[in-house]
From Swiss-Prot:
Record protein name field: Adenylosuccinate synthetase
Cofactor(s) this protein cannot do without: Mg(2+)
EC number: 6.3.4.4
HAMAP family: Adenylosucc_synth (MF_00011)
PANTHER family linked to this entry: ADENYLOSUCCINATE SYNTHETASE
Pfam family, one: Adenylsucc_synt
Organism: Sodalis glossinidius (strain morsitans)
Length: 432
């Protein structure tokens, strides 16, 4: 019997999860998003055609796969309808392939207004959120005032609850942030206009997944963002508002934790980060510019330029520890082609001179950290599109082996280009 697989990022997001999920869904029956919202940006390239998904699971392009948005996701009806419209215009029957948990909190206009107002008020100390209302929506969930998909089944009760929440937000927007208010009637009209679409896809996700498990159907859980952006384990406060780590699968989907069999960590061959926050290996020189341009390091969601740097094995080891990683998928190896030298950060030197091999938690404790590098020869030959490990340049193979050695985790998949075909699977996660 095959295994249930989690795919998640080991760094600060943007590792290339979407492509890997799309590739592996060939064997999965269910693909589940279990955290985050439309702040994610998963780019798929299939036969040269590019698709960017923000909220809908990457399995949606597969005919025989059921895509699920589970309870751990905060759902923007506006973003969902836009994404569905784009896919349906291409002939993809989204409503036949996708299901939604009734427990998903909704992201509405007042969440976006609050997100934008807060970031503006922070000024130079801004977190660097996407401004899409993710954080405020998770706040409402924890404060037990969230409006959820299931609330749409009773429109009168929904309208009453919405009025209370809009009043609460408008008071803050006006009196604390000196920002414009949100129009209650407009918010209500907008959500009720699409309520039938959302309620038409509602299912008890936990029940569905448990039944699927008993039948032996294969499941894949698609993480968004990356481990180092986890609300608990990331570089706080420069983090996202959800649990991006493997522990979020059980709470965010309702599948029992014993039924997760294999955790695949996606690790980019170098490091990137969007927005503010610690980044010890960040490069400000020509190499950093080379990685940004060649790697096309611009956010799929925001279009923002990503910061770039050498691979940080210390940070990746933290991801190994937190997620109990079974194996790695190494992505964007081809971006390193042509560099005379490649480096891996294997330890940090603290301001007091001590050398440590683990990451701090709070962002302020990262200040003054100096990366300690191992240097390795680069390679001039192209790795782009290579589909056999022994066909890679020797120096590239040594680089991969060194990553395995310093992290203690095998590289089971290597990606050498954006297309799903430009991948070598050394060990299939479903059979590992």
């Amino acid at each position: 019997m095959g295994k249930n697989v989690v795919v998640l990022g080991t760094q600060w997001g943007d590792e290339g999860k979407g492509k890997v999920v799309d590739l592996l869904t060939e064997r999965a029956k269910y693909v589940v998003r279990y955290q985050g919202g439309h702040n994610a940006g998963h780019t798929l390239v299939i036969n040269g055609e590019k698709t960017v998904l923000h909220l809908i699971p990457s399995g949606i392009l597969r005919e025989n796969v059921v895509s699920i948005i589970a309870n751990g996701v905060v759902l923007s009806p506006e973003a969902l309808m836009k994404e569905m419209g784009e896919l349906e215009a291409r002939g993809i029957p989204v409503r036949e392939r996708m299901l939604i948990s009734e427990a998903c909190p909704l992201i509405l206009a007042y969440h976006v207004a609050m997100d934008v107002a807060r970031e503006k008020a922070r000024g130079a100390k801004a977190i660097g959120t996407t401004g899409r209302g993710i954080g405020p929506a998770y706040e409402d969930k924890v404060a037990r005032r969230a409006l959820r998909v299931g609330d749409l089944f009773n429109k009168d009760t929904f309208a009453t609850k919405l009025k209370e929440v809009v009043d609460y937000y408008n008071f803050q927007l006006v009196h604390y942030y000196q920002a414009d208010t949100v129009d209650y009637q407009m918010v209500l009209d907008d959500i009720l206009a699409v309520a039938y679409v959302l309620t038409g896809m509602v299912v008890d996700v936990s029940e569905l997944l448990d039944s699927a498990r008993k039948r032996g159907d294969l499941m894949m859980f698609e993480g968004a963002q990356g481990t180092l952006l986890d609300i608990d384990h990331g570089t706080y406060p420069y983090v996202t508002s959800s649990n991006t780590t493997a522990g979020g699968v059980a709470t965010g989907s309702g599948l029992g934790p014993r039924y997760v069999d294999y955790v695949l960590g996606i690790v980019k061959a170098y490091s990137t980060r969007v927005g503010a926050g610690p980044f010890p290996t960040e490069l400000f020189d020509d190499t950093g510019e080379f990685l940004c341009v060649k790697g096309n390091e611009f956010g799929a969601t925001t279009g923002r330029r990503r910061r770039t740097g050498w691979l940080d094995a210390v940070a990746v080891r933290r991801a190994v520890q937190i997620n109990s990683l079974s194996g790695f998928c190494l992505t964007k190896l081809d971006v390193l082609d042509g560099l005379q030298e490649v480096k891996i950060c294997t330890a940090y030197r603290l301001p007091d001179g001590r050398v440590v091999e683990s990451t701090p938690l709070a962002a302020e404790n990262w200040e003054g950290i100096e990366p300690i590098y191992e240097s390795m020869p680069g390679w001039s030959e192209s790795t782009f599109g290579v589909k056999a490990f022994d066909k890679l340049p020797e120096a590239a193979r040594r680089y991969i082996k060194r990553i395995e050695e310093v992290t203690g985790v095998p590289v089971d998949i290597v990606s050498t280009g954006p297309d799903r075909s430009e991948t070598m699977i050394l060990r299939d996660p479903f059979d590992a």
